[in-house]
Amino acid sequence: MSEGKIVQKTEVPATVESLQADLHALGVKPGMVVLVHSSLSALGWVCGGSVAVIAALQKALGSAGTLVMPAHSPDLTEPSGWESPPVPESWWPVIREHMLAYDPVLTPTRSMGIIAETFRKQRGVLRSAHPQVSFCACGPQASRITNNHALAFGMGEHSPLARIYDLHGFILLLGVDHGNNTSMHLAEHRATFPTKRVIQQGAPIATADSRRWATFEDVDIDSSDFDRIGKDFLRSDAGHVVRRGRVGLADCQLMPQRDVVDFTGGWLEENRSN
């Protein structure tokens, strides 16, 4: 959405203070661990843009809280699997040989939104080591969340998603829906269903003096039914844990990650049957 259209739909600009108040009303409290998926344009016009949104989140969480965001870089993946857009097969060996290695400081996010990309570059933010599905975190639990992110099965048991689960963290959908809810991928890794596939992935990683193309196993993830899962979760008995409200102009949801992951695992085993 263009900035002009955002201005047109906004009656009063959002500020750090107004966003913090909205977050508090939604249920964000000091000391929480919160994984945020976000859309800046959904919030309306914000004084200070993405920097102000992050400031509001950090103020709402306080010094004891930990803010987490996805920092994925899907362009550092096996090129034979690219679809949006695909590239010629003759390019694949060139990409594998020459794609720059993942660097937690330099590698930008892709398709995560400007709030997540801004957060990645801020002082004090830690980023996990996975070349494709890294996460960034800031706060007392940041090291625990981002350390020891395994290369294989990058959104499974040895991932930041699993550490957030261990910490009884929360998911905040800030103007986005469950199609963006990466915690459901943790459920994909844990659940057993007939269509589940393990694939060979690849990515460029740094070595002591250069880089190499590493290959590793991963679950062939699929988010196409995540919105349906989210709607079923809201309608279920488990859905009472979801807090819904407005932050700026955005429809938002705050929920315990464990409840979402556990429900999603059961849903996948029941519904992904063919």
PLM regions with names:
Residues 1-274:
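N-terminal and secondary-structure boundary signal
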